[in-house]
Amino acid sequence: MGRLVAIAIGSTAVVALGVIALASRRPKSAPPKRVALIGDSYAVGLGPELAKLIPDFKYEGHVGTSTSAWANHTAACGQCGDWLTAFKPNTVLVSLGVNDGSAPSIANYQRIVQGLNGIGADVVWIEPPAAVNTQSRNTIASLGGLRGRVTGTRAPLSPDGLHPQQYGPWAREIAAAIST
């Protein structure tokens, strides 16, 4: 009988050690990501939807703004992301380019990326919806310094031919892309 008790106690100890070993192998949860979004009318539409999906999130968007406005800090872009330094985002989503016309300036894109990298943020550029014909897509594809790009949504466009009918599906695509 004493031997059975010893075996039972020994087995319990081994199982307990195994549980402790498994628990210590689990990855520690990363601190919540701070995510920001800056941009044009797409940011205006995406911001409220992404705020539902990302706990530590802030955004600024201004209809009709271009990379030139943001890169050169013009009045058109309001604060132009001045709040980003205090917010200290890990990742900044940039939704700009569709308003740049037929000859986007790579220098404006690079200035934005360098400025955001300079505050310690990874930059993920959000391309315009796939059905929107824009020269900015090639410029975005050629950028260095990005953590990544989110290709344009294939969601149906509104009658204006530029904006999605609904921003929720696009926001979910973006949130999934940056969580990997």
Q: PLM features: residue spans?
A:
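Sec-exported extracytoplasmic/periplasmic mature domains
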Residues: 51, 55, 85-88, 97, ...
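Short amphipathic alpha-helical segments and helix-helix/interface helices
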Residues: 50-51, 110-114, 137-144
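Single-pass alpha-helical membrane anchors
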Residues: 2-25
